[in-house]
Each structure stands twice: as structure tokens, then as C-alpha cells.
From Swiss-Prot:
UniProt entry keywords in alphabetical sequence: Antioxidant, Disulfide bond, Oxidoreductase, Peroxidase, Redox-active center
Gene Ontology MF terms: alkyl hydroperoxide reductase activity; disulfide oxidoreductase activity; hydroperoxide reductase activity; peroxiredoxin activity
The name this protein goes by in its record: Alkyl hydroperoxide reductase AhpD
Organism of this sequence: Hyphomonas neptunium (strain ATCC 15444)
Catalytic activity from the UniProt record: N(6)-[(R)-dihydrolipoyl]-L-lysyl-[lipoyl-carrier protein] + a hydroperoxide = N(6)-[(R)-lipoyl]-L-lysyl-[lipoyl-carrier protein] + an alcohol + H2O
The keyword Disulfide bond belongs to this UniProt entry's keyword annotation: yes
Class of enzymatic activity (EC top level): oxidoreductase
Record HAMAP family: AhpD
Entry keyword Lyase: no
Family membership noted in the UniProt record: Belongs to the AhpD family.
InterPro entries (UniProt xref): AhpD, AhpD-like, AhpD_core, CMD-like
The protein's role, per its UniProt record: Antioxidant protein with alkyl hydroperoxidase activity. Required for the reduction of the AhpC active site cysteine residues and for the regeneration of the AhpC enzyme activity.
Superkingdom, taxonomy of origin: Bacteria
Length: 180
């Protein structure tokens, strides 16, 4: 599978999503590694089988083994951090925001790829998972490293489109499995 295959699976009612998959893949504002790492981290975050298989296959042709693993690691660690930090931010008792997380997250300090790339991937996943506190933290870190607003937006857009594609395909699969 590939992004082209993924696009063919998207029904006509979601044509905008199908077109966005292709247009984002053709954008040059992010490096190839940044772009396909965002796609892969986002696909792992949403976990829908067809989306994940298509994007994983595409990414294998574009990313080094180290970058593949780092994109997956970004999704994994954000799966934990986004829930934890979103919860501490949302709970009314502010005590939790002052407590140490006491969760292992060493991959953030040593992801095996450029820090900026890992931060972009973490940002895309944080957008999918809806953690405002994490989005603010990753955006601030990216800005410190000279990443532009347009590049940050591109990562978020990739996350949004991958999420939408996965939701469409999951809904279609659920309907297809319904007994007649």
C-alpha cells in the first residue's frame, strides 16, 4: 500500500480528505523526513489498520530505520504524555500540575533523529490527541529552534488529515461489517 492506495480507499463524500492527502504529500515546506515522519507518527496515533498500513509502506520508502523508529516512538510517548498532561491540566485541583510526572520518557531527550523532527512529530500527535498543554510546549520548543509558523502548521495539518482519513475508513469498515 501507499498514499496513492490510501487515497483510492477514501469515498467521494470525503473527497476533500482524499485531495488533502495528496496535496500535503506534495508540499515542500517540511523536509521529506519531517513530512513522512509526521504522516507515520500520526498514523500510529490513530491506529486505523488501512491508514496505518498505507502510510507505513509509504514511509518505509522515504525514511531511514532510525527515523521510522523515532516517528513510532513519538506516537508512543505522546500516547502516554498527552493523556497525563491533558488530565493534569483539566482537573480542577491545581496540585497535580505541580507534581512531578514520575513517568519514564527518555526518548524525548534522545530520539535518534534531529530534535526538531521529533518535536514536529510529537506536535502532530498532540494535535490528534487534543492535549493543549503539550501543543503549547512543543510549539514553544520548535519556535526556539527557528521553526516557522508555516512549518508548525504543516505538521498539524498532516495530523488532522491523517486523523480524518482514519475516521472515514473506520466508519466505512464498521458499516461494511454490518449484517444485511
Amino acid at each position: 500500500m501507499s498514499l496513492e492506495t490510501l487515497k483510492t480507499l477514501i469515498p467521494d463524500y470525503a473527497k476533500d480528505i482524499r485531495l488533502n492527502i495528496g496535496s500535503l504529500a506534495n508540499e515542500t515546506i517540511l523536509s521529506e523526513q519531517q513530512k513522512y515522519g509526521c504522516y507515520l507518527a500520526s498514523a500510529h496515533a490513530v491506529g486505523e489498520a488501512q491508514t496505518l498500513r498505507a502510510i507505513e509502506a509509504e514511509a518505509r520508502g522515504k525514511l531511514s530505520v532510525e527515523a521510522l523508529n523515532a516517528a513510532k516512538a513519538a506516537s508512543a510517548i505522546m500516547g502516554m504524555n498527552n493523556v497525563y498532561y491533558r488530565a493534569t491540566h483539566l482537573v480542577s485541583n491545581t496540585t497535580y500540575t505541580t507534581m512531578p510526572a514520575r513517568l519514564r520518557m527518555n526518548v524525548i531527550g534522545n530520539p535518534g533523529v534531529e530534535k526538531v523532527d521529533f518535536e514536529l512529530w510529537s506536535l502532530a500527535v498532540s494535535a490528534i490527541n487534543g492535549c493543549g498543554m503539550c501543543l503549547d510546549a512543543h510549539e514553544a520548543e520548535l519556535r526556539k529552534h527557528g521553526v516557522t509558523s508555516e512549518q508548525i502548521q504543516a505538521a498539524i495539518r498532516i495530523g488532522a488529515v491523517v486523523n480524518a482519513a482514519a475516521r472515514v475508513l473506520a466508519a466505512e469498515a464498521a458499516l461494511a461489517a454490518e449484517p444485511a
